[in-house]
Amino acid sequence: MSKVIGIDLGTTNSAVAVLEGKEPKIITNPEGNRTTPSVVAFKNGEIQVGEVAKRQAITNPNTIVSIKSHMGEEGYKVKVGDKEYTPQEISAFILQYIKKFSEDYLGEKVTDAVITVPAYFNDAQRQATKDAGKIAGLNVQRIINEPTASALAYGLDKDENDEKVLVYDLGGGTFDVSILQLGDGVFQVLSTNGDTHLGGDDFDQRIMDWLIQNFKEENGVDLSNDKMALQRLKDAAEKAKKDLSGVSSTHISLPFISAGEAGPLHLEADLTRAKFDELTDDLVQKTKVAFDNALSDAGLTVNDIDKVILNGGSTRIPAVQKAVKDWAGKEPDHSINPDEAVALGAAIQGGVISGDVKDIVLLDVTPLSLGIETMGGVFTKLIDRNTTIPTSKSQIFSTAADNQPAVDVHVLQGERPMAADDKTLGRFELTDIPPAPRGVPQIQVTFDIDKNGIVNVSAKDMGTGKEQKITIKSSSGLSDEEIKKMQKDAEEHAEEDKKRKEEVDLRNEVDQLIFTTEKTLKETEGKVPETETKNVQDALDALKKAQKDNNLDEMKEKKEALSKAAQDLAVKLYQQNGGAQGAAGQAGPQGPQNGGQPNNDNGSDNGQGGSTVDGDFHKVDPDK
């Protein structure tokens, strides 16, 4: 097998590495740099990539930056002249450039690659990344998470067993914290958390805003609308940020930045590290949320962490390093170049695929929960977030109406308990279900997530063996903002969600109780005196009235009354018939109290009401 290169396709910068012997090595670009700006420009019919494109990013309107933030975003396109490009196509230009100079370095054709993505990338974004690789002529052998890749680079030659490692990854446009366990060649991700709209660009912007404000106060000129000035300010802000990682103060000089009534105007400013820390303190503190959540999701405290790894160029900022040290209670490991660790780790994974690296197993996780919509609009999870991948999970569901000929499977991703608040990944239909009473058909829904975090869903009628499958397409994925909003909303609306979930559960229980009680009364008709069933019938009528009036308090009260009446009837039937008929009668009215709950035995049915979930699948008219 030919060499498998490892690519860190970053928001701001990208890097590439390859395994030489047993060691990963960064491949420099034609300019001799170890990282390449993730910038694409169109000028005079020529496509420019990297440093040359970055230098004229603001002055040339046909320059695309940070395209990674739009990967997997449905309908998003960049218009250049009379042509439109998808994020996959723009990313492919970057990958093609990387592929070309990698081939020049290796002296052979490159066809295979491992590409990294932020840990919080969803299915759609991962699919889009694979598509970009295909467009660039690369066979993407594996998609792995950036923090996981950096841990691979750190742990390749480590012999310690059962190390728990926290990876703090602050890049140019994204931020992640991951907790991994390393031991005996196994790299297992325990949890991941992050903010996909936070990175070094935000720190640069704070310096730019400060310079613009000061210049406006001193000269009465607003530079924020001057494209030429903004390009120079952006470059100066990035340089000042980097300088302040090594010195306590830096001088910013931008002569002839603008012009006033008296002639040319020059920008001169001194920025101290203390002032920079003040301007960006809230950004640093914002990362603490993901830091704490990652530990909590892994069921750990900082005392359980053996090593802390800093990843991403923005972790060179002294205030960031100090904050992580204070939070973790230990000095971060500085043995890996934070700009290069991800690409190095990807190259190691490439070595695993090609067979050059032995005895390493990578176990990653899925960042968001996956499931389907069930009765009452509830989001029923089949795979929880932070589940190790690859994985597969099956669960039995049933129909919501008698003689229902088809089910519509609504696939969702998110953390909210109600389907309407989560993100639709796809829908598909399972048809030709034989006529049967509600709750009788057994529909097995299976979720499969492969090693790249890409989702496949199937639904199978266990009675007929008929099956329908779907692979979630990238056009239906989530944006970075939607992922962040999902978890934020889940925290802010926890109480509201709980109340809505309880209401839906009550309605489901009432509906099921009415259904089975009516069935029981019909089965006992003519077999027992009406005086024996009058209390049940009266309680049933009262519950149906409360349901019609949509009175939740009344529904709860009348449901309990009907359950008690049904229980009393079951006892009488048991006494009259020696137990056999009574047992059946008891199972009928009581079963609904447990109905509509997920079955956790992956399809085993013990005949009780709690063995399947009412799917509330949409009824399909076979004549349409």
Curated annotation (Swiss-Prot):
Q: Which Pfam families match?
A: HSP70 (PF00012)
Basic and acidic residues bias: start-end ranges: 481-504, 615-624
Q: Keywords of this protein's UniProt record, alphabetized? A: ATP-binding, Chaperone, Nucleotide-binding, Phosphoprotein, Stress response
Claim: ATP-binding is one of the keywords in the record: yes
Spell out the Low complexity composition-biased ranges. Answer: 577-605
Upregulation details from the record are: By stress conditions e.g. heat shock.
InterPro entries in the cross-refs: ATPase_NBD, Chaperone_DnaK, Heat_shock_70_CS, HSP70_C_sf, HSP70_peptide-bd_sf, Hsp_70_fam
Kindly list the GO molecular function terms attached to this UniProt entry. ATP binding; ATP-dependent protein folding chaperone; unfolded protein binding
Task: List the PROSITE patterns.
Answer: HSP70_1, HSP70_2, HSP70_3
Q: Does the keyword Kinase apply?
A: no
For the region Disordered, what residue ranges are annotated?
470-504, 577-624
- Residues that the record marks as modified (Phosphothreonine) are 174
Q: What does this protein do?
A: Acts as a chaperone.
Family per record: Belongs to the heat shock protein 70 family.
Name the record gives this protein: Chaperone protein DnaK
